[in-house]
Amino acid sequence: MEQDAMKYRLVTRSDFDGLVCGMLLKEKDLIDEVTFVHPKDMQDGLIAIDGHDITTNLPYVEGVHLAFDHHYSETLRVEQQDNHIIDPEARSAARVVYNYYGGPEAFPNIAPDLLEAVDKGDAAEFTVDEVLDPQGWELLNFIMDARTGLGRFRNFRISNYQLMMELIDFCRNHSIEEILETPDVKERVELYRAHQEDFKRQMYNCSRQIGRVLLVDLREEDTIYAGNRFVKYALFPEACISIQVMWGFKKQNTV
């Protein structure tokens, strides 16, 4: 497949899948800018999209140059478009990008274990051990997820956006062991580890299972610790859905 001569902006989610999509498109020298957005903002038309944009793992918006996705729901919502590269059988948007541009032959510098890790992460196919004591790529996945909540506890040297931008380049030619030892990743790992056991106890003590539903009530907690969003399911393996209740801003409402 011929490589486009011009450069595009990548519009994607601020998560591990978005990070790897950025790596792949940067490896093909297709992008010179990255914008991280929320999917609902795309659906609500709040993000201006045109022919200079490539989107990944987001709802399709008309006018985009290329849109990569793997959600089956998008095949129902949107009529088939030539620039909508969607594969519901793929476990991640990064895998769709990877396959579209030629797979391993097109990306000799991208380690296969990285693609397996992003597939596992986006499809939530973690083992209990990987959830409760993550290592390697799984650990990077969780610390880069805003839902883990690390940003509530420390003003890091650089923002998550800056770290994502640095990792798009750094991850292309460094091992996961080297990535986890970089200062800006390491300080997030240290905070994650410092909260790990407290978060498990909190999830266990504040949760009540009703059938297959897990109710997590955090309104009596002075501190809500940081931790990955799958821990509660590892602690309560019979639950298949959870409802989390906590105070809103200045306890004016519950959310």
What residue spans do the PLM features occupy?
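Hydrophobic, aromatic-enriched interface-forming segments
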Residues: G121-V213
